[in-house]
Amino acid sequence: MRKSILLIFATLLAAAGSARSIDIIPRPAEITEARGEFRITAQTAIAAEGELRRPAEIFATDIEPVIGREIPVAAKGEILLRTSPSLAAEEYTLAVTPRTVEILGGSPQAVFYALQTLRQLVATDGTVPAVVVRDKPCFAHRGGMLDSGRHFWTVDEVKRFIDILAMHKLN
């Protein structure tokens, strides 16, 4: 009896551990998991024009160390970036399906935040779980503090700190 309970517990624990959990920092307002995953391949491109081109280029550069290649930014692609006046300035929706990743933001800044969320979802093998994320900040001002009074920070360290703040959607 004791062995069967232990075996059942071990099986449940193994099953729970094998499922990929959706962990995003900070936690979005709404996450809906779906079936399947999007795979970033050598043919994957980011579709971005105008003001959205710069956030797309930053994302492509940031994701290169994770997947081993940079994603090109073009007029057409599987990762679609758009803005909508119907959304609040920093509000976004990120929809990942097995075929496409669609990002709709209230502004280029919101699209940048959505790309930071996507950055956290990308696995080292280039897969992204199918999910719909809807988010907007709870607070207008979000930030971090760098105490430079007790320790000298080099320019590169300060830039790295700013990159970490941006990755966590702090303004």
Regions found by a protein language model. Give the residues of each.
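Hydrophobic h-region of N-terminal signal peptides that target proteins for export
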Residues: 9-18
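Short amphipathic alpha-helical "recognition" segments used for binding
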Residues: 6-7, 68
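Substrate-binding cleft of carbohydrate-active enzyme catalytic domains
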Residues: 139-140, 144-171
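Contiguous, structured surface segment used for ligand recognition
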Residues: 20-142, 147
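Intrinsically disordered/low-complexity terminal segments and short unstructured peptides
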Residues: 7-10, 43
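Positively charged n-region of N-terminal signal peptides that target proteins for export
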Residues: 1-4
